[in-house]
Amino acid sequence: MNLTNHFLVAMPGMKDPYFQHSVIYICEHNEEGAMGLMINAPIDITVGKMLEQVDVQPVHPQLNTSSLTKPVYNGGPVAEDRGFILHRPKDFYESSLQMTEQISVTTSKDILTVLGTEAEPSSYIVALGYSGWSAGQLEAELAENSWLTVEANPDIIFDTPIAMRWQKAVQMLGIHASQLSDQAGHA
């Protein structure tokens, strides 16, 4: 089982309050563990403020200031000082990984210099930190019914209002959120 390019959707009975109602985009999943980014947990800082704090100046003069008001996301509890940008592929940056034709993840600082300009990716989210699992840990959580999984949809990441992302991810499974029980168990 490889869940790269899938969503982890928290079950209603998720015991860990940090991940309640979270949707996590899985960037990597292999025998060593898994790594992903929460896509529905905005924090109280905008992209523009974050760029000011890390002292990054745009390299292109044509500013697109509306994108600087986007929220930054809490990607997860690991390495919260590290930034990750999920975006629609446009240019290649120093450290980018194209996950699909419609989703890339970049960790290099060069992408920050184009945010807020005409040269920025058409859609993106900035996350600080990531969610990580050691070997076998995610599989154990899946066996405990902590998560649902579904193939990732870029429209949920980039175009769905933040408050609707969990519900839309559940709907991709062909069910309504009200059909989910907050009680875990096995038949």
From Swiss-Prot:
It comes from Vibrio vulnificus (strain YJ016). Belongs to the UPF0301 (AlgH) family. It holds the Pfam family DUF179. This is UPF0301 protein VV2869. Disulfide bonds: none annotated. HAMAP family: UPF0301. Gene3D superfamilies: VC0467-like, VC0467-like domains. SUPFAM superfamilies: VC0467-like (SSF143456). The lineage of its organism: Bacteria, Pseudomonadati, Pseudomonadota, Gammaproteobacteria, Vibrionales. It comes from the Bacteria. GO terms for cellular component: cytosol.
